[in-house]
Amino acid sequence: MAFKSFIYSKGYHRSAAQKKTATSFFDSSYQYLRQNQGLVNSDPVLHASHLHPHPVVVANVNYNNVDDILHPHDLDSSINNTNNPLTHEELLYNQNVSLRSLKQQQSTNYVNNNNNNQHRYYSTGPTLPTNQYDPLNFSNRNFQDLSLKTSQPSVQQPQNEYSLLKDENAPVWKEDTEPCLNKSTYLQTHIDEINRCYEQKNYNKINSLYQSLKRNDIVPPLEIFTKVLDSLCKRPLDNNDLDNKMYELLTCYQDMINNRLKPPDEIYNIVLLSLFKGSILAYQFENPNGSDFYKIAIELFNTTTNDPKQKSVVKFRNFSKDVLDYNLLAMNIYPGHITLSKAQQVIKSSPAFIKDSFYFIACFSYAKLTNDKFAIKELYEDFRLSLSSGSPDQGLFDDQFEIYSVILSSFIETGEVELATNLLDDLVSKIQSSNGLASNISLLLSSFLISMSKVDPSKAYEIWFKFHNLNWIPEFSYEFYLVFMANSFQDWNLTKKIYDYIFPMERNLSPLKKQKLSDYLLHPIGVDSITTSLLDYSLQLKDNEVIMKILEESIVKNFSFDIGIYPFVFNYLREIQCGEDYLMRFIESHAEFIKKSNSINKFQFLNMIVDNFQSQSLLNKISHAKFFKNFVEDFNLENCELVSYNGLISCINNFIKIPKTIKDFPYILEIHAILVTKLFDFDTYPILQNGNNEVLLKFRDQIEHQFKMLAQNFCRLNLDPNLLAGVVSQAMKMVNLDDTANGQDLLNFFNHPGDWDKSYPLSLGSFIRNSPRGGIREFTKLSKEGYCFDYDTYKELIIKRAINKQIIDKCLEVCPDSIELKNIVNLMISKIPGRNLTQLIINNPKFSKVFVPNLRNDSMLKLIENCESLSNFIRICDFPEKFKSIAIQAENKNAIELIYERLFDGGKYADILRYNNIVPVLNLELLLKSCIRSGEFKKYESLSKKFNDKISESSKIDIQLEYLINKNDLKGAFTLFEKTPRELRTPHKTMDLYTFALFLDSFNRNITYYESPENTLQFANILSSQTSFINLLSTYNLIAHSDHLMNFNVGGMAAKVKKEILNQMLNNLYDSIRLLSPSIENDKSMKEKLREKVKNYCRFKAYLKSPELDMDELKTLVSVESFLNPFTPSMLFNNLIETIYINEHASSLVLQNGLIYSLQQKGLNKILSYLEESFITSGNDANIEKVREFRSLLRKSKPLQA
């Protein structure tokens, strides 16, 4: 059990006399749980345990020894100043007595010495009260030293000797001036650290801090107990060890009770919620301690709510909603420990109580389990009253059919079949008339039929058959049929009918973790074992047809049985003389599932095979199967008392008996080497050596002998040691080669092939794990010398983020299998920084064939987020062609959404619509906006009608506004905006569109806008709407410096905000050309207004003291100017030539209205490349030649920056 590794944390070195008694309500279940799970001192002593002292004890002893050396005078005074010291003989005698008798003797000997004894406290060990020595701190050597000290007068050390200690240049720690442990300081320090860890959510550390306080008998306040308990529930340290989590939680809670601290309701909520959740998890994962967890929880629940004065009255407790819900669920899993009336009384008295759907589902379910007809009728009336009230809970109304399904089940199982039938008719008619969901019908009928099958399986089958012939009745789930079949086992013919029906169906079981708590009660749990039960019945009845169908189904549909059924299966296969091929197929299929279970099941599985089949050819096939190596790697001597290894031993013995080929040598040696490392492991070797298991002792000697014989034969045949796994050379160091001829040469043959053959892969994995810097340094050195390395080395380098192109290529080259390839590919992407992904991964020649097929969703997301060119990434991935499959689309749902979002942000609207024909866009808003912005208005209108009911009202308005704006129907856009109520306007977005429409309308009329903007985009739209520069400046000053409008003026207007506004104003000018180009070309006044707005933008940019343009801004500005003057690129080129002609080393290019473009840091090369592209697009060959000629002249005079 997991409890056995936590002896020290319970303080096993203390006596029972030091422990305080727990309260009565906590004794029964908790003490039972502790005594039966090894919580106290009931653990058996491990063999040779003296070789492995507990690390905490070692640390404590070492610390105290060092402290004694630093303060020897304190130790002397504490012993020598006593008036009646113990003699040497008495101390030796007392070493062997119990702590209780020692305390009794010391209370007699030191009754008059209470005021003279001085006792120091240690923060790393338990503190005992005055006059009580801990015998564990005295060794024989100490007793002799102390007896000598009592007879010798203490000599004061010279003052200069102490001064030498004080003059040490680098003290190990700050000098402790306290004569003993200052408990208040110690407590406050720990409180501060616990609070800090709690705030940082470092929950793993908090319990160790509390244990430090506990070891020193310091009791923290209730607030700290609350945080400790909460951290125990939340810490990830023991997420996979439920027993330990519950043990630590209950121990901490009992400590609080023992110290007579009254828990507040917050602590009750933490403890109860954790216990209820723990009991549910234990049930799911078949942990036998689940019932004990629930017993403790319900006992605590009852005790905290019972009023000792009036037993019929419930004490008020402020339980949380989660505690109430999980209590209701746990009640249904472990029924009979509390009455429904008591539970309802407590739940209804809590302020968090809500009469929601889960309350009714859980209560009906519990009343059904306890066969409480009266409670069911009361609940039914209460439910109908709640549903028909003037303002019923919306959740209750939405989930009413879930509740009705439990009501139907309750009526049938308590004998009210006729009432249930009438109610079902009414409900089905109601759903049909209201065009309700098919899932509601399926849920109602499933509950009705499953409950009916418990009462009368034949009648239930007749009803199902009638429903099955109705086209409007949906198909039932696979789980439904399994439960239906389980309830019909007494009628074997009916069972076979149901099994024949579900035999071709896909085995689709719901996951253990449900979406809602009510799903645990509405849908069957633990149905995966029903097939095992069916197989068990068929084996008992010797129904060959059903048996073989189940066995074949398990192979085809990939599922396993409970481990206890396999002996009977193999016995049956032996009786029918099953062929080896089919038998091996069955074994390999089921071994793949056994691989995922614990090691005990693996060896039990082997034992079952060997008990029924001893064929050498079969055992040879098993020992060479893929799963066998995994089984061998799980061999552990710690389990030798729990499981027999006869099956494994038989398979290994078979290695020697059968003929071997040279190809078999590496594998056989590897299997033997793994066993050698397990049998001679330092930690488990004493278990076998000191035990009485003669079979394993003989097996160990046999393995050692066979391994040395195989190694010698391998060497004599002069085979290539590079073919062997690294574990072989490791095992050679563990066996005794003294009695082997040329033992050292044999060892060198296996251990040093790299010295004479650099093609032998070296293993630096463990070196890198233990010392990353040293390991990476050694790897770099050996790589330069031409050595190669194994897969583990490269994997560890990737884990430590030491990644380059060579390591990636080599790692992929030596990757052992496809499963590991998928893991390593995703590990690489998770460890490589985002800025390097394009260079190392996306541009890798193997990206398309190796990386893409193995990418998980999170890895794909990281690549898309960090790729430098999305179009290049899409091309390499072959999107969307390789994403046609629905399964691939479901697996990469988030990645596909991100691709479409980035395409949308990049303005690739036509690409989105084209890809949508192959891989549908799930974001409807994005799809509709892409239709609008690409000019596909008819497609937008058809899609808008098709998906009208799947888009929210506010989103519809925003999309329609954008549609009207893009159609240049500004009047319609303003009308729609004015008709839209404020509550339907999307914050920011709706006003963004409205202010942009005002900007477009400013080409036709003067715009006056009085509402304050909500963001920089609206601010930029308002500024762009101004026709004159004076109006623009006045609007800017009014808004930017107003505290009531926008808080831009924090320490001066931030440069980031200014840049956003200017970029958005420039984008507005560019969008106006796209949207209004036909009108502007035909209307001179509009063209003049555009020219004025461009000029206003340039002047405003200079006014804000940010005249510099980057390359993107320059491109956009040139595009706008080119619309007004097609010769703008040529004018820019002429300006550049003149600037360079005047000053060859010019740092910037001066443009109109004082704008500047920097020619430093690749700027000159970028502008030339842009001009060349621009002239190529316009087909201006003459200017293209001029740009190229100018570039060549510049190269001669000074090198252009690449």
UniProtKB/Swiss-Prot annotation:
Catalysed reaction, written as an equation: Endonucleolytic cleavage of RNA, removing 5'-extranucleotides from tRNA precursor
GO biological process, one term: RNA processing
Superkingdom field: Eukaryota
Compositional bias ranges of the Polar residues kind: 118-134
Assigned EC number: 3.1.26.5
Keyword Cell membrane applies: no
Localization annotation: Mitochondrion
Residue ranges of the region described as Disordered: 109-134
Function, as annotated: Ribonuclease P generates mature tRNA molecules by cleaving their 5'-ends.
Protein name: Ribonuclease P protein component, mitochondrial
UniProt organism field: Saccharomyces cerevisiae (strain ATCC 204508 / S288c)
